[in-house]
């Protein structure tokens, strides 16, 4: 544990900055406003009653922050007219949004300076095509085939508010800024409780997206810091004072004896101990830790992580949040796919002169399946079909024009096919296309007070072309004799589209 503490202090030694005086600078809030406008996600900040950013209100905010009783009034009256000023409710909502956003800009400065001032151990190459979330799937196809075990980790959100502040205290040794952070957290949740209310988390995330992302990323960076430590120090954990590592010491002595008798075996095994081939992927509050080795060794890795997480965060890490499974016998839910690495047999016929040989080869392949049941459940929730998958009309869209209705249904269908184009079994996607296409026909028929059969006969092939993906249209142009009504495309080809940088709306709720 002393080695871990020394490594932790060395890692955080470059992050001592005093940033609280920057809160009294007007340009900080202008930066916050610009970041809000240029954000990749739509945000509702720096506005009050549909009013835009005002430098005059910022000056008034800074002037009131200089007053001695400013924070006293805010703490004594936290529920009157929103935040920060219970006497002038007209500006209170503006202040409650602009001050946390400005605070987020300020506390992010030390982390940016750390990247510039601290020496880099190794330059990491940048690849432009890795912006896509789908870039992870070719990585899984390349790496996971050679691994044995996989751990599903649920990053825990129930954590005491004071622990969040203490985590930042190691990086930002600025007492006024930490007190201000305590004030923000105290406003959205009871200080004597844990963050277990999803309602409080949703409210805080909705109104202060930038501050929420900063706190979450800080928490996750500390969470993942242990993985970096264990990865670099995997062969340097012989704590003689702990009984947990007694077996490792005996194991090392056995390795010395084996090294004398079998030098080649000794080098190979030591390489395995020093380089456990760990691969870590994090997504949407969950993480996957895959490694190579025996089940017993991976189980020990699991408990190393749990014990160190408990030591770092000072709370009980629930062991059930880390699920350890054999990669060949299990599947995992990952970014809208049910993925696994099953072993499949490949029969190869080989003929040499007059002899014929049949060779049965066992191969591993990354299998990605579309969770059709979950997608049908979400389509049912969006009122495109019933719970059993029977298509129904969408009455709320009957006020739109015909081509707007066609465009909306067609866009949803194309997005689903576009996102799940990497599936190894696409047959289930055509069931979703059937649901959306018939739901669209029922919606149009309901609008024109007609039957589905009559309306589809009137539209003809134009109605079907709206639901075709780009890949299918290319194939339909290449093979003109193929009927548009019976075309099904290839079920085995997998195409990873690298232009998707976020999960579409129909996939996001599934994770």
Swiss-Prot record:
Localization in the cell: Plastid, Chloroplast
Respond yes or no to whether keyword RNA-binding is given for this record: yes
Biological-process GO terms, alphabetical: mRNA processing; RNA splicing; tRNA processing
Q: One Pfam annotation, family name?
A: Intron_maturas2
Cite the InterPro entries for this sequence: Domain_X, Maturase_MatK, Maturase_MatK_N
One function term, GO molecular function aspect: RNA binding
Q: Which UniProt keywords apply?
A: Chloroplast, mRNA processing, Plastid, RNA-binding, tRNA processing
Q: Which domain of life is it from?
A: Eukaryota
One Gene Ontology cellular component annotation held by this UniProt entry: chloroplast
Q: Give the disulfide map.
A: none
Keyword hit for Chloroplast: yes
The record's family statement is: Belongs to the intron maturase 2 family. MatK subfamily.
What is the role of this chain? Usually encoded in the trnK tRNA gene intron. Probably assists in splicing its own and other chloroplast group II introns.
What is the designated name of this protein? Maturase K
Species whose genome carries this gene: Avena sativa (Oat)
